[in-house]
UniProtKB/Swiss-Prot annotation:
The organism of origin for this protein: Aeromonas hydrophila subsp. hydrophila (strain ATCC 7966 / DSM 30187 / BCRC 13018 / CCUG 14551 / JCM 1027 / KCTC 2358 / NCIMB 9240 / NCTC 8049)
GO biological process, alphabetically ordered: hydrogen sulfide biosynthetic process; sulfate assimilation
Family annotation (InterPro entries): CysN_GTP-bd (IPR041757), CysN_II (IPR044138), CysN_NoDQ_III (IPR044139), G_TR_CS (IPR031157), GTP-eEF1A_C (IPR054696), P-loop_NTPase (IPR027417), Small_GTP-bd (IPR005225), SO4_adenylTrfase_lsu (IPR011779)
UniProt-annotated stretches for the region G3: 112-115
Keywords: ATP-binding, GTP-binding, Nucleotide-binding, Nucleotidyltransferase, Transferase
Subunit structure: Heterodimer composed of CysD, the smaller subunit, and CysN.
Gene designation: cysN
The keyword Nucleotidyltransferase is annotated on this UniProt entry: yes
Region (G1): 33-40
Lineage: Bacteria, Pseudomonadati, Pseudomonadota, Gammaproteobacteria, Aeromonadales
Name recorded for this polypeptide: Sulfate adenylyltransferase subunit 1
SUPFAM superfamilies noted in UniProt: EF-Tu/eEF-1alpha/eIF2-gamma C-terminal domain, P-loop containing nucleoside triphosphate hydrolases, Translation proteins
Length: 475
């Protein structure tokens, strides 16, 4: 057992300790930056200096540092995080590594994401659930293209809080001038990003300067340490202020006397007595019970797995979205979205993919790529396809109407994945910007052709027939 935890349990008792842990706030954050900026070392330093390493881990780390370490006689703290053998042997991070730790003030989940451009998809995966991003910058190199790329992706994935850690300050003799030059350059670049708060902090992860404890070598820096910034960062409460969104995962009917609809509340505070609408059908009813494994609730918060029952018998199935009847999202078959392409084969407009948005499954295709984003310079370039790890702004059409919110407002109902229909492999991740109007083909059509078109679109949506209208009928 970890000595820090053992001491806490002996002082408080096991029940009091577990109760305190359960009620601490949780911050999810990721570390990202250029290759070999020290991401894994920084996480190892956080774990080590906050006394979150178990005795057996420490012994294994001492042994591994002698065999695989890159820090001489010192502990190579990066080995705490670089779990894959390929990563350890190469001294780089490839996969997204998750780590958990806590302090007296807060619990943390860390995503250590790869710095290489060919692993952009891995980084997007790690960023999608985080509240805050730590952007590492090598004090010797300053702001690089990879720094800009990671900052842009984190912003695109909805992260609003950045902590920029200017690392390896020991290699520039803890120079205030170097730190201030890098700070000014990064803040100028960050004006292009959709970020609410940016803190910039000088650190040396190798020796622990200003990571957990203040350093005399950085006496000119008057701000907080890195850990202090993480402990004081605002945990995202915005979801509670948004309207209720509950994607239906399955219909719960254990007997003839009970019929509930189960799912994880995506946003809003749901209360017994609330009036909800079912989308896309639009039917409405009042919530009579909120049921959980531990019993009934008067209200539910975002992230809770619940089952709701209604006053009326209405048709609801998996994939439907239960929403605040007074604050409904848009429903459409046409979307504008940023897509991060994760497939080995390029994204080709016109090819049909399976689409999963929350619990809703449909089929769809990219009608057009408006532009590809050159993620190192943030330039918008013309493109006819998207290759592995590329990001583009795309027009997407679906076979079924879907209810959605813009991704920057509610992640769960504003994101989707594209699945290859032959291999069942996830090949793309999408963040919805807005809905688009349906495309209409106009011309001279007979009344029969217009009616047949409406019939085909209603009963055979997977044919993806365009809506047609008769010019003469508009005159």
């Amino acid at each position: 057992m970890n000595n820090h935890i053992q001491t806490a349990i002996s002082e408080q008792g096991i029940e009091a300790y577990l109760h305190a842990q359960q009620h601490k706030s949780l911050l999810r954050f990721l570390t990202c930056g250029s290759v070999d900026d020290g991401k894994s070392t920084l996480i190892g330093r956080l774990l080590h200096d906050s006394q979150q390493i178990y005795e057996d881990q420490l012994k294994a780390l001492e042994s591994d540092s002698q065999k695989l370490g890159t820090t001489g006689e010192k502990l190579d703290l990066a080995l705490l995080v670089d779990g894959l053998q390929a990563e350890r042997e190469q001294g780089i991070t490839i996969d997204v590594a998750y780590r958990y730790f806590s302090t007296a003030k807060r619990k943390f989940i860390i995503s250590d994401t790869p710095g290489h451009e060919q692993y952009t998809r891995n980084m997007a995966t790690g960023a999608s659930t985080c509240d805050l991003a730590i952007i590492l910058i090598d004090a010797r190199k300053g702001v690089l293209d990879q720094t800009r790329r990671h900052s842009f992706i984190a912003s695109l994935l909805g992260i609003k809080q950045f902590v920029v850690a200017v690392n390896k300050m020991d290699l520039v003799e803890f120079s205030q001038e170097v730190f201030e030059r890098i700070s000014a350059e990064y803040r100028e670049f960050a004006k292009k990003l959709s970020v609410d708060t940016i803190h910039i902090v000088p650190v040396s992860a190798l020796d622990g300067d200003n990571v957990v404890n203040p350093s005399d070598k950085l006496a000119w820096y008057q701000g907080e340490t890195l850990l202090s910034l993480l402990e004081s960062a605002e945990v995202e409460r915005e979801l509670e202020r948004h309207p209720v969104r509950l994607p239906v995962q399955y219909v719960n009917r254990p007997n003839l006397d009970f019929r509930g609809f189960a799912g994880t509340l995506a946003s809003g505070i749901l209360r017994v007595g609330d009036k909800l609408a079912v989308l896309p059908s639009g039917k409405e009813s009042t919530v009579t019970r909120i049921v959980t494994f531990d019993g009934d609730l008067d209200y539910a918060l975002p992230g809770q797995a619940i089952t709701v029952t209604f006053a009326d018998e209405i048709d609801i199935s998996r994939g439907d979205l239960l929403v605040d009847a007074a604050r409904k999202p848009l429903v459409t078959q046409n979307l504008l979205a940023h897509i991060v392409w994760m497939g080995e084969e390029s994204l080709q407009p016109g090819r049909v993919y399976d689409v999963k948005l929350a619990t809703k499954k449909s089929r769809g295709q990219v009608e057009a790529i408006r532009h590809r984003i050159e993620i190192n310079k943030l330039d918008e370039l013309d493109a006819s396809e998207l290759k592995l790890n590329e990001i583009g702004l795309c027009e997407l059409s679906l076979t079924d109407p879907v209810a959605f919110d813009p991704y920057q407002e509610i992640r769960d109902t504003g994101s989707f994945i594209l699945i290859d229909r032959l291999t069942n492999v996830t090949v793309g991740a999408g963040m919805i910007v807005e809905g688009l109007a349906a495309k209409v083909a106009t011309g001279h059509y007979s009344e029969f052709e217009v009616e047949l078109n409406a019939l085909v679109r209603k009963h055979f949506p997977h044919w993806q027939a365009l809506t047609i209208s008769n010019d003469a009928s508009k005159e």
